[in-house]
UniProtKB/Swiss-Prot annotation:
Keywords: Amino-acid biosynthesis, Arginine biosynthesis, Cytoplasm, DNA-binding, Repressor, Transcription, Transcription regulation. Gene3D superfamilies: 3.30.1360.40, Winged helix-like DNA-binding domain superfamily/Winged helix DNA-binding domain. Regulates arginine biosynthesis genes. The gene is argR. Transmembrane segments: none annotated. This is Arginine repressor. GO terms for biological process: L-arginine biosynthetic process; protein complex oligomerization; regulation of arginine biosynthetic process. SUPFAM superfamilies: C-terminal domain of arginine repressor, Winged helix' DNA-binding domain. Signal peptide: none annotated. Belongs to the ArgR family. Pathway: Amino-acid biosynthesis; L-arginine biosynthesis [regulation]. The lineage of its organism: Bacteria, Pseudomonadati, Pseudomonadota, Gammaproteobacteria, Aeromonadales. It is found in: Cytoplasm. One of its GO terms (molecular function) is arginine binding.
């Protein structure tokens, strides 16, 4: 089997495993891939693959921290369980701050950035579990705060 074919099969198997949203550690992924016949796989290869495919750690339906792939097509919507990843929304008169489950901030920020200036969002900065939302110059911060609360079905 050619090297490229092996790499393709490994990538396909890797993505399939992450879509199951049940692997909480790189060691678990290594074991699963080895059981699938990829005997030369190790933790460092899995780590590189996680980075290459943009995998993130987030909570699954059972509230376990697991590796998963970001949504590959389109921008996430609030009808998906993303709203469940938002823990708190607040503001200080200048910025709106959103606290999320660990690993979820960049995904939520992507959604907010897609709303853009029409919704009063100049831009976002996201870490692992915190997002800063900068309003446009003509946006009232209180209105942006209330919009964010409504978007993620939070109460003030």
């Amino acid at each position: 089997m050619k090297h490229n074919d092996k790499q393709e099969k490994l990538a396909k198997a890797f993505k399939a495993l992450l879509k199951e949203e049940r692997f909480g550690s790189q060691a678990e992924i290594v074991t699963a891939l080895q059981e699938m016949g990829f005997e030369n796989i190790n933790q460092s290869k899995v780590s590189r693959m996680l980075s290459r495919f943009g995998a993130v750690r987030t909570r699954n339906a059972k509230m376990e921290m697991v590796y998963c792939l970001p949504v590959e097509l389109g921008v996430p919507t609030t009808s998906s369980p993303l709203k469940n990843l938002v823990l708190d929304v607040d503001h200080n008169g200048a910025l709106v701050v959103i606290h999320t489950s660990p690993g979820a901030a960049q995904l939520i920020a992507r959604l907010l950035d897609s709303l853009g200036k029409a919704e009063g969002i100049l831009g976002t900065i996201a870490g692992d579990d915190t997002i800063f939302i900068t309003p446009t110059s003509d946006t009232d911060i209180e209105e942006l705060y209330l919009s964010a609360l409504e978007l993620f079905e939070q109460t003030p």
